[in-house]
């Protein structure tokens, strides 16, 4: 069977086994993608009216969020057989599924990092506990295939890839603006992707994540990462850059964000404000997300500062970037592609290399199906952004998943939690979240 025949076969199977979602909601509710609103046109007018542009810097007040819920979760999709070229062909065959083209363009512009294979080997841990920390499939692969070290992260790297995607899109927004779409400033895009090449020379490579995870987070190579370990790796790797353009604030063991601590990172010693990524690690229930948090979680993706959610799927991790009513749109890292090479000259990256980091294929998951353990991210670019974000956090309908206070009690030796913090949100530790977020 030729490669072309195999591609057609994969798309044929995918069409029936893993269908792409269509915009079949009856309420005509808008779609939100990282703080941008895409209205849904009436079907009778779609042939005569083009899609409305996204509303810049505008998001719904919490009180106006849709309250109607679908009674039956829509079909979710797990795994895929698509290739980057196959994705484009499948898109053409299925038209746009009723989705606004402006939303699809925005979705496709997001950097999508997935499992990779045939990259320089990541050495195995010599710790006797390392083998037992792996899943059975990864353990067998390490003994039968990757005997000289891990040359693929298939089966264990999904949370790392979700975290990489989150960080890459934060850098994309910071460097190129929220309005960037594919086909513009391609060299700048290549520079960002080169930071995530599957090579130890790349500062945000999977090799660097695994290295820091082993040295500081108790994670062995081949072991699943959770949101907490991923957040700590993002912070450490960003801080290790000589001229870091982005600083990182993590909430640690709770969902409380403290202004004094945040400002000490964003503008230490009262220096100029440096754009700062806020990473909130939380667990919003035991097995499923508790309904009192639904509106707040949906609202988090409507804020202009949002750069998405990593995690949130039982037995796997995804990167969520959009929401419509109670359906969340995500990029799925569970597709193994050839390693993204490291290039000294970014102009040497091929179109195929770049295309492998984008997709126009939508995936959708109802909030009822999401795992409660996750990493919620926001990019704060200046002090005005901070003030606007802090104000928006207070306007959330229902129980909030993020709380902002002026000062960190620990800074004054008080060592106490904010009153009611434990009752409001159940947070995670690595021992808990890694049993939920497999690869």
UniProtKB/Swiss-Prot annotation:
Residues 64-75 have a biased composition (Polar residues). It is found in: Cytoplasm; Nucleus; Preautophagosomal structure. GO terms for biological process: aggrephagy; autophagosome assembly; mitophagy; piecemeal microautophagy of the nucleus; protein processing; protein targeting to membrane; protein transport. Its main location: cytoplasm. GO terms for molecular function: cysteine-type endopeptidase activity; protein-phosphatidylethanolamide deconjugating activity. It is an enzyme of class 3 (hydrolase). It comes from the Eukaryota. The active site is at residues 158, 332, 334. It holds the Pfam family Peptidase_C54. Keywords: Autophagy, Cytoplasm, Hydrolase, Nucleus, Protease, Protein transport, Thiol protease, Transport. InterPro entries: Papain-like_cys_pep_sf, Peptidase_C54, Peptidase_C54_cat. Residues 76-87 have a biased composition (Low complexity). GO terms for cellular component: cytosol; mitochondrion; nucleus; phagophore assembly site. Its EC number is 3.4.22.-. Residues 48-92 are annotated as: Disordered. It catalyses: [protein]-C-terminal L-amino acid-glycyl-phosphatidylethanolamide + H2O = [protein]-C-terminal L-amino acid-glycine + a 1,2-diacyl-sn-glycero-3-phosphoethanolamine. Coiled coil: none annotated. Cysteine protease that plays a key role in cytoplasm to vacuole transport (Cvt) and autophagy by mediating both proteolytic activation and delipidation of ATG8. Required for selective autophagic degradation of the nucleus (nucleophagy) as well as for mitophagy which contributes to regulate mitochondrial quantity and quality by eliminating the mitochondria to a basal level to fulfill cellular energy requirements and preventing excess ROS production. The protease activity is required for proteolytic activation of ATG8: cleaves the C-terminal amino acid of ATG8 to reveal a C-terminal glycine. Belongs to the peptidase C54 family. This is Probable cysteine protease atg4. It comes from Botryotinia fuckeliana (strain B05.10). The gene is atg4.
């Amino acid at each position: 069977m030729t490669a072309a025949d195999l591609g057609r076969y994969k798309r044929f199977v995918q069409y029936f086994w893993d269908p792409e979602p269509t915009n079949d909601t009856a309420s005509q509710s808008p779609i939100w993608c990282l703080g941008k609103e895409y209205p849904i046109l009436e079907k009778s007018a779609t042939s005569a009216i083009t899609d409305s542009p996204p509303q810049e810097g505008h998001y719904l007040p919490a009180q106006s969020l849709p309250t109607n819920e679908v009674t039956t979760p829509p079909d979710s999709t797990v795994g895929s057989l698509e290739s980057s070229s196959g994705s484009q062909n499948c898109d053409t065959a299925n038209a746009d599924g009723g989705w606004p083209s402006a939303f699809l363009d925005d979705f496709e512009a997001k950097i999508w990092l997935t499992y990779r294979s045939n990259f320089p080997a990541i050495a195995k841990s010599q710790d006797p506990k390392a083998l037992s920390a792996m899943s059975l499939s990864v353990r067998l692969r390490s003994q039968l295939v990757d005997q000289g070290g891990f040359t693929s992260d298939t089966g264990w790297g999904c949370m790392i890839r979700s975290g990489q995607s989150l960080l890459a899109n934060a850098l994309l927004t910071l460097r190129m603006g929220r309005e960037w779409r594919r086909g513009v400033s391609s060299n700048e895009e290549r520079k960002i992707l080169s930071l995530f090449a599957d090579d130890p020379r790349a500062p945000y490579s999977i090799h660097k994540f695994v290295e820091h995870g082993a040295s500081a987070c108790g994670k062995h190579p081949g072991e699943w990462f959770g949101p907490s370990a991923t957040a700590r790796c993002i912070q450490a790797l960003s801080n290790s850059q000589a001229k870091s353009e982005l600083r990182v604030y993590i909430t640690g063991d709770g969902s409380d964000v403290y202004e004094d601590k945040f400002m000490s990172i964003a503008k230490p010693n009262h220096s100029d404000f440096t754009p700062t990524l806020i990473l909130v690690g939380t667990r919003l229930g035991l097995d499923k997300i508790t309904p009192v948090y639904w509106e707040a979680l949906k609202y988090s993706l409507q804020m202009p500062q949002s750069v998405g959610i990593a995690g949130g799927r039982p037995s796997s991790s995804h990167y969520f970037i959009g929401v419509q009513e109670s359906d969340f749109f995500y990029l799925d890292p569970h597709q193994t592609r050839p390693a993204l090479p490291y290039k000294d000259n970014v102009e040497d990256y091929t179109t195929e290399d770049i295309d492998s980091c984008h997709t126009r294929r939508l995936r959708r998951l109802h909030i009822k199906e999401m795992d409660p353990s996750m990493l919620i991210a926001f990019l704060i670019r200046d002090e005005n952004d901070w003030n606007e974000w802090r104000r928006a956090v207070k306007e959330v309908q229902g129980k909030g998943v993020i709380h902002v206070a002026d000062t960190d009690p620990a800074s004054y030796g008080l060592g106490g939690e904010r009153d009611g913090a434990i009752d409001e949100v159940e947070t995670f530790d690595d021992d808990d979240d890694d049993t939920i977020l497999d690869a």
